[in-house]
UniProtKB/Swiss-Prot annotation:
Its EC number is 4.6.1.12. A divalent metal cation binds at D8, H10, H42. Keywords: Isoprene biosynthesis, Lyase, Metal-binding. Pathway: Isoprenoid biosynthesis; isopentenyl diphosphate biosynthesis via DXP pathway; isopentenyl diphosphate from 1-deoxy-D-xylulose 5-phosphate: step 4/6. It comes from Synechococcus sp. (strain JA-2-3B'a(2-13)). 4-CDP-2-C-methyl-D-erythritol 2-phosphate binds at D8, I9, H10, H34, S35, D56, I57, G58, T132, T133, N134, E135. SUPFAM superfamilies: IpsF-like. Involved in the biosynthesis of isopentenyl diphosphate (IPP) and dimethylallyl diphosphate (DMAPP), two major building blocks of isoprenoid compounds. Catalyzes the conversion of 4-diphosphocytidyl-2-C-methyl-D-erythritol 2-phosphate (CDP-ME2P) to 2-C-methyl-D-erythritol 2,4-cyclodiphosphate (ME-CPP) with a corresponding release of cytidine 5-monophosphate (CMP). One of its GO terms (biological process) is terpenoid biosynthetic process. This is 2-C-methyl-D-erythritol 2,4-cyclodiphosphate synthase. The record marks H34, T133 as: Transition state stabilizer. One of its GO terms (molecular function) is 2-C-methyl-D-erythritol 2,4-cyclodiphosphate synthase activity. NCBIfam families: ispF. It catalyses: 4-CDP-2-C-methyl-D-erythritol 2-phosphate = 2-C-methyl-D-erythritol 2,4-cyclic diphosphate + CMP.
Length: 157
């Protein structure tokens, strides 16, 4: 049994779509990054890689590599799940939280949960997705960024 944790943060900017857990969320700003900047999916990927002792997402998908420019993070997550499986692990569950002041994410959580579960070949009951605010503190609280945390439990195959 292995436990992994992941974290990611990206700036919010105008002119980019907001993608969380592979779902496009209607909002006037999106996250800035080399790929689609999906903070939630990135945090989950890092948690999976960490639990399997496989380094981090920057090692496998470096931002200076043009192959990953604008990449769909759900496709990257599927590659990470495959890597973890090749190391002899299977995912027992994932728990995650997105930290953002706006937009309100509650209406989108079921779709995000379903998309992430599908990408990891899990039941939605194995994928926890929550949202909270940062109580207007720091860059996330001021609406300048979004962050996400994730924890995963891996079991031997």
């Amino acid at each position: 049994m292995r436990i992994g944790q992941g974290y990611d943060i990206h700036r919010l900017v105008e002119g980019r779509p907001l993608i969380l857990g592979g779902i496009r969320i209607p909002y006037e700003k999106g996250l800035l990054g080399h790929s689609d900047a999906d903070v939630l999916t990135h945090a989950i990927m890092d948690a999976l890689l960490g639990a399997a002792a496989l380094r981090d997402i920057g090692y496998y998908f470096p931002p200076e590599d043009e192959r990953w420019k604008g990449a769909d993070s759900i496709l990257l997550l599927q590659q990470v799940v495959q890597l973890v499986g090749q190391e002899g692990w299977r995912i027992a569950n994932v728990d995650s939280v997105v930290v953002a002041e706006q937009p309100k994410l509650k209406p989108h959580i079921p779709a995000i949960q379903a998309r992430l579960a599908e990408a990891m070949q899990l039941s939605p009951k194995q994928v926890g997705v929550k949202a909270t605010t940062n109580e207007k503190l720091g860059p996330v609280g001021q609406g300048e960024a979004m962050a996400a945390f994730a924890v995963v439990l891996l079991l031997e195959r």
